[in-house]
């Protein structure tokens, strides 16, 4: 969901993960907060992941006034390929598509990589810790 365009939708994936009626919204602005809340009420949503631009303090504060809590912030890095080219591939690390036989090893890497990770799911005290951990390894 891009942050430039307002979108809201039910989130069956999060509902399955946590057994809570869930939705996701992106591109949230102060003007869209009432519409977003109406959507949640209409659909019985009690767990909403809402994203707004970090520079849009008005949107964040409007959500806080409605009882929302800030769980995390995200930073996206970009690189202009016009200003500097991608470095040449030195073939030091082989890259290939994952095979079905790799499944257990990939899960093991994910489990180790996200051990003690604290994401926005973990920041919500209503959510069971083991289910939060499973989000990053499933």
What residues fall within each predicted segment?
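Short hydrophobic/aromatic beta-strand element in the GNAT-like acyltransferase core
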Residues: 60, 137-138
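Short, flexible segments with low predicted structural confidence
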Residues: 11-12, 33-35, 77, 111-116
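Conserved GNAT-fold acetyl-CoA-binding loop/helix
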Residues: 118-137
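A structural signal for well-ordered alpha-helical scaffolds and beta->alpha junctions
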Residues: 33, 70, 103, 107, ...
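STAS-typified acidic loop motif
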Residues: 4-31
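Acyl-donor-binding surface of acyltransferase catalytic domains
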Residues: 26-102
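A short beta-loop-alpha structural element at the N-terminal edge
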Residues: 27-28, 94-119, 129
């Amino acid at each position: 969901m891009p942050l430039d365009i307002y979108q809201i939708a039910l989130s069956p994936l999060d509902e399955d993960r946590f057994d809570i009626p869930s939705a996701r919204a992106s591109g949230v602005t102060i003007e869209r907060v009432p519409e977003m809340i109406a959507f949640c009420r209409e659909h019985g949503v009690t767990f909403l992941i809402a994203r707004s631009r970090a520079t849009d303090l008005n949107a964040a504060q409007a959500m806080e006034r409605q009882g929302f809590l800030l769980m995390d912030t995200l930073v996206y890095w970009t690189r202009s390929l016009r200003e500097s080219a991608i470095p040449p591939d030195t073939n030091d690390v082989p890259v290939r598509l994952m095979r079905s036989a790799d499944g257990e090893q990939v899960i093991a890497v994910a489990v180790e990589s996200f051990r003690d990770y604290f994401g926005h799911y973990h920041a919500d005290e209503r959510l069971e810790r083991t289910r939060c951990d499973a989000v990053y390894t499933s």
